[in-house]
């Protein structure tokens, strides 16, 4: 299983939200690149970046910080938030981002996502509230089931699906393993769990369930998960 520590960018700072609410943002660092460097030192291969301002604005908003992270770290970077066109995808890949996460656009224009996945390293982000897909920075809930959206991309050439249970995001109440497995089953793709992870109990449960990867956010920042121990456990498997 792959562990992807997360950095959420808001107004140039590293923050965490609770349940996706912008007003709940808690600042953890004024220098996000230093956080990424720390993840690298702890043994991470990947960092999961989210441009929160971009997710709401529909265009890149934290470019300087993203550049700084790329310049200062040798990690693989995946990035989501505000990516709505091919020009933005190319720009980020030219910057050295390894793969890009398409979320809201996957609901609104699945054909576009298929076209992009045929050309570029693309991950689909499926965010759900009570099993229904949430879009536009989680500000709106669609009438589409998350599992139906996952099926849509089964043969589209995307690298993975990141599925977030919005109700658990930043709450450290445990990962929704059943939801993650349902997405994996529907798509047949590598599936990464996001939202709710708290400690090693969750890491072990995810490994046991055969989940491919997990995003680690608040559990690291609040100190409930020892990331080094988590990497050791995963690598021992």
Swiss-Prot record:
Q: Which reaction does it catalyse?
A: 1-(5-phospho-beta-D-ribosyl)-5-[(5-phospho-beta-D-ribosylamino)methylideneamino]imidazole-4-carboxamide = 5-[(5-phospho-1-deoxy-D-ribulos-1-ylimino)methylamino]-1-(5-phospho-beta-D-ribosyl)imidazole-4-carboxamide
The protein's superkingdom reads Bacteria
Gene Ontology cellular-component terms listed:
cytoplasm
Q: Which GO terms describe its biological process?
A: L-histidine biosynthetic process; L-tryptophan biosynthetic process
- What GO molecular-function term can you cite, just one? 1-(5-phosphoribosyl)-5-[(5-phosphoribosylamino)methylideneamino]imidazole-4-carboxamide isomerase activity
Gene3D superfamilies assigned: Aldolase class I
This protein's pathway: Amino-acid biosynthesis; L-histidine biosynthesis; L-histidine from 5-phospho-alpha-D-ribose 1-diphosphate: step 4/9
Provide the alphabetized UniProt keywords: Amino-acid biosynthesis, Cytoplasm, Histidine biosynthesis, Isomerase
Which NCBIfam families would you find in this protein's record?
A: 1-(5-phosphoribosyl)-5-[(5-phosphoribosylamino)methylideneamino]imidazole-4-carboxamide isomerase
Protein name, entry field: 1-(5-phosphoribosyl)-5-[(5-phosphoribosylamino)methylideneamino] imidazole-4-carboxamide isomerase
Naturally occurring in which organism (per UniProt): Sulfurovum sp. (strain NBC37-1)
Q: Which gene encodes it?
A: hisA
């Amino acid at each position: 299983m792959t562990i992807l520590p997360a950095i959420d960018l808001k107004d140039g700072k590293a923050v965490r939200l609770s349940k996706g609410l912008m007003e709940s943002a808690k600042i953890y660092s004024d220098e996000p690149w230093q956080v990424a460097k720390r993840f690298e030192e702890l043994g991470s291969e990947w960092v999961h970046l989210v441009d929160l301002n971009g997710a709401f604005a529909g265009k890149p908003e934290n470019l300087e910080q993203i550049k700084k992270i790329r310049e200062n770290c040798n990690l693989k970077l995946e990035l989501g938030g505000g990516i709505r066109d091919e020009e933005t995808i190319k720009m980020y890949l030219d910057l050295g981002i390894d793969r890009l996460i398409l979320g809201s656009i996957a609901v609104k224009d699945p054909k576009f996502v298929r076209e992009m996945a045929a050309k570029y390293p693309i991950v689909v982000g499926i965010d759900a509230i009570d099993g229904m897909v949430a879009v536009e920075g989680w500000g709106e809930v669609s009438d589409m089931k998350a599992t139906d959206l996952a099926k849509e991309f089964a043969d589209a050439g995307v690298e993975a699906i990141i599925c977030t249970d919005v109700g658990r995001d930043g709450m450290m109440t445990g990962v929704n393993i059943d939801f993650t497995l349902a997405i994996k089953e529907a798509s047949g793709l590598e599936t990464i769990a996001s939202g709710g992870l708290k400690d090693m109990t969750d890491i072990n449960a995810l490994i046991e369930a055969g989940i491919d990867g997990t995003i680690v956010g608040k559990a690291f920042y609040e100190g409930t998960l020892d990331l080094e121990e988590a990497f050791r456990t995963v690598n021992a498997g």
